[in-house]
């Protein structure tokens, strides 16, 4: 069987060679395919036995194939030679290519199936590479067929040196278009400013067309070029307002709709409204009538006729109901029960004191037929320090009339309270007031005026009563309440001991300073009047006739005319009869100099001792200064308020100069201060106050609260006293704050 199988394969190979020779164009491809097909057909066509002698059969086949192999080689050689002869006889073209078949055809060798499969894979790979146009690596073929078939294919190789990647070419920069908007705000302002104003006017006005016409006419008037017609139609400016002639026509049309009346009817209406006196010739002369009406409307209300009869007055009083009015101050100070008990004492005291000292004993005005001779009139005045201008009827002394008719009257509706007529000529009831407050008191019983030596704001703890800070306007001038109630609560300490500094809170309520010195100043800035007499006079508004009758010694200054009335009062013909005068209340106490005249020797001794002490003081002062350390000297400079110095000699000279100047200015304060310096910061404050009082123009600026530059103030003080250059700037600021001087930093 093995022999038969080998012969069959041999025939198959011979037939395949014959086919390959006939088809020379596809020699390489088809011969290989036929050979592969022949090899592949070996495995499925072989019929192996399934007996247990498979291994022995395999070994026998190997031996037989080994014996027959030389025979097959010889037969293949003979067959190939025969085929060559046949090809030469059949195909004459093959003579030009004698070596084509012999050189390219390899010997067909029977090989193993596994090796054949690998060969097939290699052939498929080469065929696939031949079909490719580009490939990464070139392959080397050992077969002649491959070299011949790949001769026309040129392998492309990558150069060894790679070219640098070309950079992206930047586009050439083009010029910026001027039409492009850079800033939208500038663009809107330059292009739409007029339209914006027009739109704003539209929003604020009622008629849009009217505003547009006004803007258009303004633009036409301002521009030299002829204005462009809107929408190229040549529209002209039109207005919605009426011309003068149009207004006249409208007025005529309006008057025609009203009912017509004759002049007699109008005169009757005029007479009914304004009386017979003002209705005459009212239509003939309209200007005169209007002028009379205007003047009549501006005149003050007419005073009641003094010649009225008592019966007529009683009838008016009965017909009109009394209007009871009461002010807030009267409600708070109403003491009607006390007044009823002591009315007689008050009236008698008022009659005795009003005319002698205070110049307020005015002659009662006696109306004709209204007041009986036995009536009592009490002049009630108020003590004021401020320059008060009031209404004529308010300044007119209120009279308390007790007439016989009132006393004998049994009518329950009418009481004994005084009746005072107001500006509307109505009878009104005046509620009783505290007569102790408004009637002048004797000199001995008058309470002393409260004066403020420092003029600074005082601070109190919450434990104080609010009534302590109320100022009586009849006893003092109107000022801000200096007593402030702190909103802070007092902490209850277990020990029960609280420091006064912890309960005081500085709250600035006025222009007065917020820094309170440890010791009250001996001198403060005051006007010339305050220096001469503090609280010794009052300024009141009185009749000129009554002031002339006063004692000339009581009137301190000349009379002041009333040049301006209050904003709520009306001008009357009685304004010229009043004046404002400063009347002295208490004679200033004269300082007696009897002791100094009686004992001249003692005064001379004092002068001698002071001179001796002043002569010996510089040496003693230098000894004290030299014994002190540098730290103590600097602390003394800081305490006193002088500028710091570098060396010890400069500090001693500064303190010595200050002590000499302040000792000459205040000789009474020698020896009061212990320590290094024999003076304090308060004495420096007093010395600065004395220096600034020598400049009236500066005082005027201080009193008017004008902010003064600090440099200017220091230069002014330095011109009066060179020692000011050694005073620290913070000390001057503190002194200015205590005195109420407004300062500002002058930055040059």
Swiss-Prot record:
This is Structure-specific endonuclease subunit SLX4. Phosphorylated by ATR (MEC1) and ATM (TEL1) upon DNA damage. This appears to be required for the function with the RAD1-RAD10 endonuclease. InterPro entries: Slx4_ascomycetes, Structure-sp_endonuc_su_Slx4. Residues 76-88, 222-236 have a biased composition (Basic and acidic residues). Keywords: Cytoplasm, DNA damage, DNA recombination, DNA repair, Nucleus, Phosphoprotein. Forms a heterodimer with SLX1. Interacts with RAD1; catalytic subunit of the RAD1-RAD10 endonuclease. Interacts with RTT107. Belongs to the SLX4 family.
